[in-house]
């Protein structure tokens, strides 16, 4: 069985590695939010219910829109959806850091912060969820049936690995400042999106 899109072995390997880094960055960012966001948000005055709603909205958007973006990538291209998803993730992550900074500086109140966080995480869930589904479709396009499951398993392991090392990376970044992880991981993901664009 041949692949549906012809690429050289070198191009495939490089493309898969960059995609793996992208999925790892997103997975690490998710563990960042789980590890860092709740205690920090509570320290600013947000309740457990409010923090839970922020997480739930993002997860709902991811669940509902991932299939849509996967199908959309059939028409406008895998690469475009992957880049869009990574850029949205990078932008919303950095934006969350800025929103917290505005709250700390007294430019916005707690209610405004909560509303902004809902919009930001909702944007990530509904618009940024395409990166994962389009990445899996990208792999399917460039692998044979025999090798497809193995390579997809490797791609899927990016989230598992990020779940292991993510909290440690987040803790190390927090030592430089409570908002450093947002700017750091957002910038890294944006750079990966750039690599995919030029690739």
Give the ranges of each region predicted by the language model.
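Helix-loop boundary and gating motifs at the non-cytosolic
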Residues: 9-59
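Cytoplasmic helix-loop-helix junction between adjacent transmembrane helices
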Residues: 120-159
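Residue-level signature of mid-helix packing/kink "hotspots" within the transmembrane helices
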Residues: 59-67, 163-164
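C-terminal ends and interior cores of transmembrane alpha-helices
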Residues: 87-110
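Hydrophobic core of transmembrane alpha-helices in multi-pass small-molecule transporters
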Residues: 24, 106-130
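Symmetry-related core transmembrane helices of the 12-TM Major Facilitator Superfamily/SLC fold
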Residues: 181-198
């Amino acid at each position: 069985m041949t692949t549906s899109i012809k690429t050289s072995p070198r191009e495939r390997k490089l493309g898969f590695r960059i995609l793996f880094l992208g999925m790892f960055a997103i997975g690490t960012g998710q563990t960042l939010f789980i590890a860092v966001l709740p205690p920090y948000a509570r320290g600013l005055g947000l309740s457990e219910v409010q923090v839970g709603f922020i997480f739930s909205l993002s997860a709902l958007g991811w669940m509902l829109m991932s299939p849509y973006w996967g199908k959309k990538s059939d028409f406008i291209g895998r690469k475009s959806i992957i880049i869009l998803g990574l850029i949205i993730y990078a932008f919303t992550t950095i934006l969350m850091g800025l929103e917290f900074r505005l709250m700390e500086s007294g430019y916005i109140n707690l209610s405004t912060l909560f509303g902004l966080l809902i919009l930001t995480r909702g944007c990530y869930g509904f618009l940024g969820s395409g990166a994962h589904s389009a990445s899996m479709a990208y792999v399917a396009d460039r692998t044979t049936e025999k090798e497809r499951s193995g390579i997809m398993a490797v791609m899927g392991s990016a989230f598992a690995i990020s779940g292991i090392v993510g909290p440690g990376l987040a803790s190390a970044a927090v030592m430089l400042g409570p908002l450093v992880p947002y700017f750091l991981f957002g910038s890294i993901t944006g750079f990966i999106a750039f690599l995919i664009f030029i690739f």
